[in-house]
């Protein structure tokens, strides 16, 4: 174990600070109950940073992240800053620069439907009745059509047109594929690679390299699906999937599809990693300004983001499992926040944080 783990905490805007307060309860238990050598420092980001310092990602915040072993991120954005130029708004001017600065090429989005919450899924009950489902979307985050050049708009002969370019280098596909197979070895040993190799040259290269990488992992079963078929198969039977390996564009689409069939995005964490396993960990949802300050936001995604941080950047699987089990145990006992309750009997944000913290300490 390292002598010290430095965590940069960036609560951000909207419900970010509210759910981060509950994550602090878990961090403090890790530090004082489990004796993990954590050093935690908080920094401004997003709209709150714009209000205080004029920019969404202040130099002090970036330096604090550089000196950390991982970033625990809340959420950014809100109507207050929508009048700013697009490249100065909280989302575009903070989260994207952090991803680029730290070369966070891999986005991990778990989508799990807990058996206690099957009624939340929009899918037919018979589809999810087995054991819920547990899918991990592994999305390449720094290449592909979102970053390819040329990209733009133009006019010719009285016609206006727009264009984007899908570019993937072999090393980009290679590293995300290796990560997907390595993660599958910690789960159910299945990788399904998503592409459109019947049409796109970039997908042809994608499939070729994924096949080559798979030879290094003979105990992992590899399958391939075109993106259109994959979106249908997830609805038809999500239980058939374990790890989904996706390009930037396809991963953007399919990870959101996986999220919505769980019934509540407030349950879902995410991680963005670089090759050294430095990571930015955040809830999959947004800043939800409509419920800001009402103490009804679901803190589970933020708490599970702590679990992912402990699992991937600190490599402490046993501690991460304890956090995950604490969440499962309180769900089994019937504790719910407003977004996952089917009646008015639900816990406030701080109350949910308390019961999860108590479960983590007691191990029950």
Curated annotation (Swiss-Prot):
Its required cofactor(s), as named, are: Mg(2+); Mn(2+)
**UniProt: Mg(2+) binding residues:** 228, 252, 256
UniProt entry tagged with the keyword Cytoplasm: yes
GO CC annotations? cytosol
Q: Where in the cell?
A: Cytoplasm
- Binding-site positions, NAD(+): 78-91, 286-298
The residues that the entry says bind substrate are: 99, 109, 139, 228
Matching InterPro entries: IsoCit/isopropylmalate_DH_CS (IPR019818), IsoPropMal-DH-like_dom (IPR024084), Isopropylmalate_DH (IPR004429)
UniProt keywords (A-Z) are: Amino-acid biosynthesis, Branched-chain amino acid biosynthesis, Cytoplasm, Leucine biosynthesis, Magnesium, Manganese, Metal-binding, NAD, Oxidoreductase, Plasmid
The name on file for this protein is 3-isopropylmalate dehydrogenase
Give the species: Buchnera aphidicola subsp. Uroleucon sonchi
């Amino acid at each position: 174990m390292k002598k010290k783990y430095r965590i940069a905490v960036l609560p951000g805007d909207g419900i970010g600070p509210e759910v981060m307060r509950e994550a602090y309860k878990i961090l403090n238990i890790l530090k004082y109950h489990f004796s993990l050598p954590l050093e935690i420092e908080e920094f401004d980001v997003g709209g709150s940073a714009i209000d205080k310092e004029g920019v969404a990602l202040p130099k002090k915040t970036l330096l604090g992240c550089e000196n950390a072993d991982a970033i625990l991120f809340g959420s950014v954005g809100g109507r207050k800053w929508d009048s700013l130029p697009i490249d100065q708004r909280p989302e575009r001017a903070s989260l994207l620069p952090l991803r680029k600065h730290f070369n966070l090429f891999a986005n991990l989005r778990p989508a799990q439907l807990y058996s206690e919450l099957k009624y939340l899924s929009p899918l037919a009950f018979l589809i999810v009745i087995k054991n819920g489902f547990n899918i991990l979307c592994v999305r390449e985050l720094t290449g592909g059509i979102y970053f390819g050049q040329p990209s733009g708009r133009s006019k010719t002969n009285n016609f206006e047109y727009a264009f984007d370019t899908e570019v993937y280098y072999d090393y980009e596909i290679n590293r995300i594929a290796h990560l997907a197979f390595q993660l599958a070895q910690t789960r159910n040993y299945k990788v399904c690679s998503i592409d459109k190799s019947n049409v796109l040259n970039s997908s042809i290269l994608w499939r070729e390299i994924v096949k080559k990488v798979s030879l290094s992992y003979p105990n992992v079963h590899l399958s391939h699906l075109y993106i259109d078929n994959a979106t249908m198969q997830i609805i038809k039977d999500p239980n058939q999937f374990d790890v989904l390996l996706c390009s930037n564009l396809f991963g953007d689409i399919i990870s959101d599809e996986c999220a919505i069939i769980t019934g509540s995005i407030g349950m879902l964490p995410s991680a963005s990693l670089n090759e050294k396993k430095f990571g930015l960990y955040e809830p999959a949802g947004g800043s939800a300004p409509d419920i800001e300050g009402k103490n009804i936001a679901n803190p589970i995604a933020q708490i599970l983001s702590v679990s992912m941080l402990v699992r991937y950047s600190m490599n402490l699987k046993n501690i991460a499992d304890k956090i995950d089990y604490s969440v499962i145990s309180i769900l089994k006992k019937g504790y719910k926040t407003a977004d996952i309750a089917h009646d008015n009997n639900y816990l406030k944000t701080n109350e949910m944080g308390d019961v999860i913290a108590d479960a983590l300490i007691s191990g029950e």
